[in-house]
Regions:
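A small/polar active-site loop signature that marks catalytic segments
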Residues: 62-246
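Generic structural motif
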Residues: 42, 53, 70-79, 270
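Secretory-pathway/luminal and periplasmic proteins that interact with or process carbohydrate-rich
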Residues: 30, 144, 170, 260-261
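Polar, glycine-rich mid-to-C-terminal structural blocks
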Residues: 1-64
Protein backbone atom coordinates (compact mmCIF):
# COMPACT_ATOMS: atom_id res chain seq x y z
CA UNK A 1 0.00 0.00 0.00
CA UNK A 2 1.31 3.45 -0.87
CA UNK A 3 3.21 2.24 -3.92
CA UNK A 4 2.75 4.26 -7.13
CA UNK A 5 0.65 2.77 -9.96
CA UNK A 6 2.51 0.77 -12.59
CA UNK A 7 1.43 3.09 -15.40
CA UNK A 8 -0.85 6.01 -16.26
CA UNK A 9 -4.07 3.98 -15.84
CA UNK A 10 -4.40 3.47 -12.06
CA UNK A 11 -8.14 2.75 -12.27
CA UNK A 12 -7.83 -0.65 -13.97
CA UNK A 13 -7.77 -3.86 -11.87
CA UNK A 14 -4.23 -4.84 -12.84
CA UNK A 15 -2.97 -1.76 -10.99
CA UNK A 16 -4.55 -2.70 -7.63
CA UNK A 17 -1.99 -2.84 -4.82
CA UNK A 18 -3.28 -5.62 -2.55
CA UNK A 19 -3.89 -5.44 1.18
CA UNK A 20 -4.80 -8.08 3.74
CA UNK A 21 -8.56 -7.42 3.47
CA UNK A 22 -8.99 -6.80 -0.29
CA UNK A 23 -12.73 -6.34 0.11
CA UNK A 24 -14.31 -6.78 -3.33
CA UNK A 25 -10.82 -6.57 -4.79
CA UNK A 26 -10.78 -2.85 -3.87
CA UNK A 27 -12.91 -2.39 -6.99
CA UNK A 28 -16.25 -0.78 -7.79
CA UNK A 29 -18.64 -1.87 -10.52
CA UNK A 30 -19.38 0.86 -13.08
CA UNK A 31 -22.15 0.51 -15.68
CA UNK A 32 -22.25 2.84 -18.71
CA UNK A 33 -24.87 3.21 -21.43
CA UNK A 34 -25.56 5.63 -24.26
CA UNK A 35 -28.08 6.20 -27.03
CA UNK A 36 -27.39 7.63 -30.49
CA UNK A 37 -27.60 11.12 -29.07
CA UNK A 38 -28.06 12.67 -25.68
CA UNK A 39 -26.48 12.10 -22.31
CA UNK A 40 -24.40 9.14 -21.24
CA UNK A 41 -25.76 7.33 -18.21
CA UNK A 42 -23.39 6.00 -15.55
CA UNK A 43 -24.11 4.22 -12.29
CA UNK A 44 -22.34 2.19 -9.64
CA UNK A 45 -23.19 -1.51 -9.30
CA UNK A 46 -24.11 -1.88 -6.49
CA UNK A 47 -24.78 1.75 -5.54
CA UNK A 48 -22.90 3.12 -2.55
CA UNK A 49 -24.41 5.68 -0.19
CA UNK A 50 -22.73 9.06 -0.48
CA UNK A 51 -20.95 8.23 -3.75
CA UNK A 52 -22.19 9.72 -7.04
CA UNK A 53 -20.96 9.44 -10.63
CA UNK A 54 -20.83 12.43 -13.00
CA UNK A 55 -20.68 11.49 -16.69
CA UNK A 56 -21.38 14.97 -18.08
CA UNK A 57 -17.76 15.38 -19.20
CA UNK A 58 -17.87 12.19 -21.30
CA UNK A 59 -18.21 12.87 -25.04
CA UNK A 60 -20.04 10.60 -27.47
CA UNK A 61 -17.73 9.02 -30.06
CA UNK A 62 -18.02 6.78 -33.11
CA UNK A 63 -15.67 4.18 -31.66
CA UNK A 64 -16.86 0.57 -31.80
CA UNK A 65 -18.63 -0.46 -28.60
CA UNK A 66 -16.24 -3.39 -28.13
CA UNK A 67 -13.40 -0.84 -27.93
CA UNK A 68 -15.23 1.52 -25.59
CA UNK A 69 -12.17 2.12 -23.40
CA UNK A 70 -10.03 3.48 -26.26
CA UNK A 71 -11.23 7.07 -25.66
CA UNK A 72 -11.38 6.59 -21.91
CA UNK A 73 -9.40 8.84 -19.56
CA UNK A 74 -8.69 8.18 -15.89
CA UNK A 75 -11.64 9.32 -13.71
CA UNK A 76 -11.24 11.88 -10.94
CA UNK A 77 -12.59 11.35 -7.42
CA UNK A 78 -13.19 14.21 -4.99
CA UNK A 79 -14.83 14.59 -1.60
CA UNK A 80 -17.35 17.35 -2.32
CA UNK A 81 -18.46 17.61 1.32
CA UNK A 82 -17.79 15.57 4.47
CA UNK A 83 -18.72 11.98 3.66
CA UNK A 84 -19.89 12.79 0.11
CA UNK A 85 -17.81 11.67 -2.87
CA UNK A 86 -18.15 12.38 -6.56
CA UNK A 87 -16.47 10.38 -9.33
CA UNK A 88 -16.07 12.41 -12.53
CA UNK A 89 -15.70 10.41 -15.74
CA UNK A 90 -13.56 11.84 -18.53
CA UNK A 91 -12.79 11.18 -22.17
CA UNK A 92 -15.20 9.62 -24.65
CA UNK A 93 -17.73 6.79 -24.87
CA UNK A 94 -19.27 5.19 -28.00
CA UNK A 95 -22.80 5.87 -29.22
CA UNK A 96 -25.39 3.11 -28.80
CA UNK A 97 -23.21 1.22 -26.36
CA UNK A 98 -23.51 -0.52 -23.01
CA UNK A 99 -20.47 -1.52 -20.98
CA UNK A 100 -19.66 -2.58 -17.45
CA UNK A 101 -16.31 -2.81 -15.73
CA UNK A 102 -14.84 -3.26 -12.25
CA UNK A 103 -12.56 -0.31 -11.58
CA UNK A 104 -10.44 1.17 -8.81
CA UNK A 105 -12.19 4.50 -8.35
CA UNK A 106 -12.01 5.39 -4.64
CA UNK A 107 -9.65 4.93 -1.73
CA UNK A 108 -9.98 1.40 -0.34
CA UNK A 109 -10.93 2.67 3.12
CA UNK A 110 -13.87 4.63 1.69
CA UNK A 111 -15.06 1.57 -0.26
CA UNK A 112 -14.74 -0.67 2.80
CA UNK A 113 -16.59 1.76 5.03
CA UNK A 114 -19.49 2.17 2.60
CA UNK A 115 -19.88 -1.57 2.07
CA UNK A 116 -19.78 -2.27 5.83
CA UNK A 117 -22.33 0.46 6.46
CA UNK A 118 -24.63 -0.90 3.74
CA UNK A 119 -24.49 -4.46 5.08
CA UNK A 120 -24.94 -3.28 8.67
CA UNK A 121 -27.95 -1.15 7.72
CA UNK A 122 -29.51 -4.07 5.81
CA UNK A 123 -29.31 -6.09 9.04
CA UNK A 124 -31.11 -3.34 10.96
CA UNK A 125 -28.00 -1.79 12.48
CA UNK A 126 -27.27 1.91 12.89
CA UNK A 127 -24.09 3.97 13.12
CA UNK A 128 -23.85 6.85 15.56
CA UNK A 129 -21.24 8.75 13.51
CA UNK A 130 -21.28 10.23 10.02
CA UNK A 131 -19.47 8.56 7.10
CA UNK A 132 -15.73 9.14 7.09
CA UNK A 133 -14.95 7.73 10.54
CA UNK A 134 -12.74 4.81 9.43
CA UNK A 135 -9.32 4.92 11.07
CA UNK A 136 -6.22 3.06 10.01
CA UNK A 137 -4.21 1.32 12.69
CA UNK A 138 -1.98 -1.58 13.66
CA UNK A 139 -3.58 -4.74 15.05
CA UNK A 140 -2.97 -4.79 18.82
CA UNK A 141 -0.94 -7.72 20.10
CA UNK A 142 -3.79 -8.86 22.37
CA UNK A 143 -6.57 -8.58 19.78
CA UNK A 144 -9.19 -11.32 19.92
CA UNK A 145 -10.33 -13.03 16.72
CA UNK A 146 -14.11 -12.99 16.48
CA UNK A 147 -14.56 -14.54 13.02
CA UNK A 148 -12.54 -16.43 10.44
CA UNK A 149 -13.09 -17.01 6.74
CA UNK A 150 -11.12 -19.65 4.88
CA UNK A 151 -10.22 -19.02 1.26
CA UNK A 152 -11.01 -21.37 -1.59
CA UNK A 153 -8.57 -24.26 -2.14
CA UNK A 154 -5.19 -23.28 -3.53
CA UNK A 155 -5.86 -25.03 -6.85
CA UNK A 156 -9.02 -22.98 -7.48
CA UNK A 157 -7.28 -19.72 -6.64
CA UNK A 158 -4.38 -20.60 -8.93
CA UNK A 159 -6.74 -21.41 -11.82
CA UNK A 160 -8.27 -17.94 -11.85
CA UNK A 161 -4.98 -16.23 -11.11
CA UNK A 162 -3.08 -17.71 -14.05
CA UNK A 163 -5.86 -17.85 -16.63
CA UNK A 164 -6.85 -14.24 -16.00
CA UNK A 165 -3.30 -13.06 -15.28
CA UNK A 166 -4.57 -11.52 -12.04
CA UNK A 167 -1.66 -9.41 -10.82
CA UNK A 168 -3.22 -8.45 -7.49
CA UNK A 169 -3.99 -12.10 -6.68
CA UNK A 170 -0.44 -13.08 -7.64
CA UNK A 171 1.00 -10.47 -5.31
CA UNK A 172 -1.28 -11.68 -2.53
CA UNK A 173 -0.14 -15.27 -3.04
CA UNK A 174 3.49 -14.23 -2.65
CA UNK A 175 2.65 -12.28 0.51
CA UNK A 176 0.78 -15.30 1.85
CA UNK A 177 3.96 -17.32 1.44
CA UNK A 178 5.71 -14.65 3.46
CA UNK A 179 3.05 -14.68 6.17
CA UNK A 180 3.45 -18.45 6.53
CA UNK A 181 7.23 -18.08 6.72
CA UNK A 182 7.22 -15.20 9.22
CA UNK A 183 7.66 -17.47 12.27
CA UNK A 184 11.00 -18.66 10.93
CA UNK A 185 11.97 -15.22 9.63
CA UNK A 186 14.56 -12.99 11.21
CA UNK A 187 13.33 -10.33 13.62
CA UNK A 188 12.25 -7.18 11.81
CA UNK A 189 11.78 -8.89 8.45
CA UNK A 190 8.71 -7.78 6.51
CA UNK A 191 6.14 -10.14 5.01
CA UNK A 192 7.45 -9.36 1.53
CA UNK A 193 11.10 -9.95 2.40
CA UNK A 194 10.14 -13.22 4.14
CA UNK A 195 8.29 -14.28 0.98
CA UNK A 196 11.24 -13.41 -1.23
CA UNK A 197 13.52 -15.44 1.01
CA UNK A 198 11.08 -18.37 0.93
CA UNK A 199 11.11 -18.41 -2.88
CA UNK A 200 14.91 -18.42 -2.87
CA UNK A 201 14.84 -21.28 -0.36
CA UNK A 202 12.64 -23.34 -2.71
CA UNK A 203 15.07 -22.86 -5.60
CA UNK A 204 17.94 -23.95 -3.36
CA UNK A 205 16.04 -27.04 -2.15
CA UNK A 206 15.35 -28.04 -5.76
CA UNK A 207 19.01 -27.42 -6.60
CA UNK A 208 18.12 -24.87 -9.25
CA UNK A 209 20.78 -22.23 -9.80
CA UNK A 210 19.23 -18.84 -9.14
CA UNK A 211 21.95 -16.58 -10.48
CA UNK A 212 20.26 -13.40 -11.65
CA UNK A 213 16.93 -14.28 -10.01
CA UNK A 214 15.22 -11.15 -8.68
CA UNK A 215 11.88 -11.52 -6.88
CA UNK A 216 10.09 -8.20 -6.51
CA UNK A 217 6.32 -8.49 -5.96
CA UNK A 218 5.64 -11.82 -7.65
CA UNK A 219 3.53 -10.45 -10.51
CA UNK A 220 4.15 -9.44 -14.10
CA UNK A 221 3.88 -5.77 -13.14
CA UNK A 222 7.43 -5.16 -12.00
CA UNK A 223 10.28 -3.11 -13.41
CA UNK A 224 12.89 -5.15 -11.57
CA UNK A 225 11.67 -8.79 -11.45
CA UNK A 226 14.13 -11.02 -13.34
CA UNK A 227 14.69 -14.71 -14.12
CA UNK A 228 17.00 -16.36 -16.65
CA UNK A 229 15.33 -18.55 -19.33
CA UNK A 230 17.32 -21.58 -18.17
CA UNK A 231 16.23 -21.01 -14.57
CA UNK A 232 12.59 -20.66 -15.62
CA UNK A 233 12.75 -23.82 -17.74
CA UNK A 234 14.22 -25.80 -14.86
CA UNK A 235 11.60 -24.48 -12.41
CA UNK A 236 8.79 -25.51 -14.79
CA UNK A 237 10.37 -28.94 -15.23
CA UNK A 238 10.51 -29.47 -11.47
CA UNK A 239 6.91 -28.26 -11.07
CA UNK A 240 5.66 -30.62 -13.81
CA UNK A 241 7.19 -33.54 -11.95
CA UNK A 242 5.86 -32.41 -8.58
CA UNK A 243 2.69 -33.42 -6.76
CA UNK A 244 0.94 -30.16 -7.67
CA UNK A 245 1.46 -30.58 -11.42
CA UNK A 246 -2.27 -31.21 -12.21
CA UNK A 247 -3.31 -27.99 -10.46
CA UNK A 248 -0.64 -26.00 -12.29
CA UNK A 249 -1.55 -27.42 -15.71
CA UNK A 250 -5.26 -26.74 -15.17
CA UNK A 251 -4.46 -23.12 -14.31
CA UNK A 252 -2.74 -22.30 -17.61
CA UNK A 253 -4.78 -20.53 -20.32
CA UNK A 254 -5.50 -22.52 -23.47
CA UNK A 255 -4.34 -20.72 -26.64
CA UNK A 256 -7.30 -19.43 -28.64
CA UNK A 257 -9.79 -20.74 -26.06
CA UNK A 258 -9.79 -18.98 -22.68
CA UNK A 259 -8.06 -16.59 -20.31
CA UNK A 260 -5.52 -14.08 -21.54
CA UNK A 261 -4.79 -16.37 -24.51
CA UNK A 262 -8.41 -16.40 -25.71
CA UNK A 263 -7.79 -14.15 -28.73
CA UNK A 264 -4.21 -15.21 -29.44
CA UNK A 265 -2.66 -17.81 -31.76
CA UNK A 266 -6.00 -18.68 -33.36
CA UNK A 267 -5.70 -20.81 -36.48
CA UNK A 268 -2.18 -21.98 -35.59
CA UNK A 269 -0.79 -25.33 -34.53
CA UNK A 270 -0.54 -23.96 -30.98
Amino acid sequence: IGLPPFDEAPEWPYNVIPDALMLNGNLMGLALSSADSGAIEARLVPPLEGVSVDASALALTNTACADWDEDWLAPRAAETSPGQWQITLQGGFPRRCEAQAALQLLDRNVITERHVRAVWASLGGRFSSLPGSVREGVLPAGAERIAQHDSRPWGEVLRHMNKASDNAQTRLLLLQLGAAAMKAAAHGMTTLSAAQRDVQRWFDEQRIARDGLVVDNGSGLSRSERIAPRTMARAIEVALNGRHAPEMLMSLPVAGVDGTMRDRLKGTRA
